């Protein structure tokens, strides 16, 4: 198995291990984060109904404007601020953070810190 495949399998194992322990509710939805090489995505998910309450990503025009590159920590921080703003508009202040198997470092940490600075608690 190649080293890339091993990393992907390890991430999926971490993802399932974390997902068994946390769930989102209407009062405290799950803040799910996904990152690719060029973009980062965040969603607020109510697991009882399976509904996405709010989402933000570097593909959105309001987040992407002013960024020269969308795959770095600066872009992740803008996504964190945007998802926090959308959550506060829906009167959501507390969430459960789901790093989706990614290590809490770099872009994931930047998104989480920006969301906390803009009013979300987790």
Swiss-Prot record:
Gene Ontology CC annotations of this record: cytosolic large ribosomal subunit
Subunit relationships: Part of the 50S ribosomal subunit; part of the 5S rRNA/L5/L18/L25 subcomplex. Contacts the 5S and 23S rRNAs.
Annotated family: Belongs to the universal ribosomal protein uL18 family.
Classification via PANTHER family: 39S RIBOSOMAL PROTEIN L18, MITOCHONDRIAL (PTHR12899), LARGE RIBOSOMAL SUBUNIT PROTEIN UL18M (PTHR12899:SF3)
CDD domains cross-referenced by the UniProt entry: Ribosomal_L18_L5e
SUPFAM superfamilies linked: Translational machinery components
Signal peptide start and end residues: none
GO MF annotation: an example: structural constituent of ribosome
GO biological process: translation
UniProt keyword annotations, A-Z: Ribonucleoprotein, Ribosomal protein, RNA-binding, rRNA-binding
Pfam family membership, one: Ribosomal_L18p
Keyword Ribonucleoprotein: yes
Superkingdom per UniProt: Bacteria
NCBIfam families with a match to the protein in the record: L18_bact
Protein name: Large ribosomal subunit protein uL18
Function, as annotated: This is one of the proteins that bind and probably mediate the attachment of the 5S RNA into the large ribosomal subunit, where it forms part of the central protuberance.
InterPro entries (alphabetical): Ribosomal_uL18_bac-type, Ribosomal_uL18_bac/euk
